[in-house]
Amino acid sequence: MNSVPSKLEKNNIDELYRKNQVKSVSFLVILGGVLLLTVLLSLRAGSYETPIGELIKGIFGMSDDRKINIVVQNNRLPRIVTAILAGGGLGLAGCILQAVLRNPLASSSTLGVSQGATFGAAFAIVVLGLGATDGLGIPMCAFLGSIAVALVILGLSKFRQVSPEGIVLAGVAISSMFTGATTLIQYFADEVQLSTLVFWTFGDLGSTGWEDLGGMAVIVAILCTYCFAHRWDYNALLSGEETAISLGINVKRLTLVGMVLCCLCSSVVVSNVGLISFIGLVAPHIVRMVVGNNHVYLIPGSILGGATLLLLGDLFARTVISPVILPIGAITSFLGGPLFLYLLFKGGKKQ
């Protein structure tokens, strides 16, 4: 029997691919539009109510009201940029962790990577006595904490052949260990250190200024560039490690570099805004439901989705009981937890 596809079958495949391509691109455009709309809504949110036209002028310092320029440039705009960088970075990190571990439940929060980074930051503040003026001390300790967790997860996945569900359970155990260790450090902290540590556990997008965003922007840009350059490698990895190797892909290097960059991104986010949970899990899954597993669209979609979700969460936190601003970490955990349970039980039901 002839196994070569007929011309009609090829045409059907091409047509199906084109339709999926149009759907994916359209979804990314819509997602970008939603992000832009959320940015405009976030600009308006606050006790100082201003017409949107004046706010847009304030971005460039062109408003006739000097107070508007100050509020927009020094308060609202840095908060929005922080949410976009942190949310986009966490969304992409979750997408890549799910690809290299071939685990749909993987993310920096469910695997304990973010909790390891939080412990590293707490250790730097209380035990080493470092502060915000000590340069890269706190981010470096946060990175070491996250990379320690990543090495454990990588070892369990590659060398012990633990199942995807087992990896998630190991991540829960590791998260509990590092959360307990962070709590012990808090117990021995003085009042100033304790108030700083509360920031890490609650999450706060409003404490960063323009001078703090440069490092996070560079790390997120490096992660985005590397991952998009290897988008076809991640697609090949979906077919299995053996298939990827047969196509000439260095799977070990792809996995290791991807995990290191994801840990670096998670640690720099934790260092700047504290512990933000579930964005890296939720964003890739929402995008995947529309565009599928093609990383050509999944990678930019996860970036846009993560940025939009975190910005929406921050908008909710700032407006639900205004003028009180709720901690963004609590909001993302409250909204992301039920989805995590849904994905977990859905996966178990299929098996």
Where are the language model's segments positioned?
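Alpha-helical transmembrane segments in inner-membrane proteins
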Residues: M1-Q351
